[in-house]
């Protein structure tokens, strides 16, 4: 019997709509983002998914997406676990910058490397930057040494994996059906891990907002199959839109 896991990237955020790098900045959803989250819930309901537990990050765009989706699923009562380890990749000094302006300044190739490569970090924020996570009380209990000032996708995977191993994998091994509402890069990290994707191929993997990605896993948590729910062509178009965000006009 296969285990079921759904990865759900949050709906469109206010900075997604403005084409800005977001990272750990706590930006809310647009109205379209709420609608995407609700539609995701309907798609999961149509699939007949009955979850046992849900996980999300400490950022409200993922939290609110989960809330909207669970309401549409009529599964608001589910236990929800939140962890900083599911936060978006920290984009360092790029956070808040317009992606098109950044591509015009540094070149599309460089921006694409910063956005989609596996092991290259963007420039870091300074320790005295007001947006440094150590100044955010939601991270007050964490050792400052673990708080990032920039991250590559590799760093993000190294951050996410302990939570996968300690919290999520044991639930799947207990035959629970699990929903994760998180972010483009924390989910790309899990996608890479689950599919054993190469460092080169992950460059071209783009996860669209608000479309559930259903994995069926074996009893050893190996991938049996995975697919986006709903219209596959719509998911492909949405992924292409994500890929084009870092291109100069």
From Swiss-Prot:
Q: Name one GO molecular function term.
A: phosphoglycerate mutase activity
Alphabetized, the UniProt keywords read: Gluconeogenesis, Glycolysis, Isomerase
Q: What Gene3D superfamilies does the record point to?
A: Phosphoglycerate mutase-like (3.40.50.1240)
Q: Which PROSITE patterns match?
A: PG_MUTASE
Q: Its pathway?
A: Carbohydrate degradation; glycolysis; pyruvate from D-glyceraldehyde 3-phosphate: step 3/5
Residues the record marks as site: Transition state stabilizer: 183
- Family annotation (InterPro entries): His_Pase_superF_clade-1, His_PPase_superfam, PG/BPGM_mutase_AS, Phosphogly_mut1
Q: Where does substrate bind?
A: 9-16, 22-23, 61, 88-91, 99, 115-116, 184-185
Q: Which Pfam families match?
A: His_Phos_1
Per its record, the protein catalyses: (2R)-2-phosphoglycerate = (2R)-3-phosphoglycerate
Residues of the active site are 10 (tele-phosphohistidine intermediate), 88 (proton donor/acceptor)
The task this protein performs is described as: Catalyzes the interconversion of 2-phosphoglycerate and 3-phosphoglycerate.
Q: Which NCBIfam families does this entry report, sorted A to Z? A: pgm_1, PRK14115.1
Q: What is this protein called?
A: 2,3-bisphosphoglycerate-dependent phosphoglycerate mutase
Q: Which organism is it from?
A: Xylella fastidiosa (strain M12)
């Amino acid at each position: 019997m296969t285990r079921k896991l759904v990865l759900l990237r949050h709906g469109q955020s206010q900075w997604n709509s403005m084409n800005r790098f977001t990272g750990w900045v706590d930006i809310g959803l647009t109205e379209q983002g709420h609608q995407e989250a609700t539609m995701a819930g309907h798609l999961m309901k149509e699939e007949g998914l009955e979850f046992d537990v849900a996980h999300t990050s400490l950022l409200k765009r993922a939290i609110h997406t989960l809330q909207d989706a669970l309401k549409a699923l009529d599964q608001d009562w589910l236990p929800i676990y939140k962890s900083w380890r599911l936060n978006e990749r920290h984009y360092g000094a790029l956070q808040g910058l317009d992606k098109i302006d950044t591509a015009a300044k540094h070149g599309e190739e460089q921006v694409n490397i910063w956005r989609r490569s596996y092991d290259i970090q963007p420039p870091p924020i300074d320790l005295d930057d007001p947006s440094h996570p150590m100044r955010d009380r939601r991270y007050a209990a964490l050792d400052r040494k673990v708080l990032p000032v920039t991250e590559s996708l590799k760093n993000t995977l190294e951050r996410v994996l302990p939570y996968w191993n300690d919290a999520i994998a044991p639930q799947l091994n207990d035959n629970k059906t699990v929903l994760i509402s998180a972010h483009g890069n924390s989910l790309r990290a899990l996608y890479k891990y689950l599919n054993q994707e190469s460092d080169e191929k992950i460059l071209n993997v783009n996860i669209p907002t608000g479309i559930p990605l259903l994995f069926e896993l074996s009893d050893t948590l190996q991938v049996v199959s995975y697919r986006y729910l709903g219209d596959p062509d719509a998911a492909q178009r949405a992924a292409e839109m994500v890929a084009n965000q870092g291109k100069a006009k």
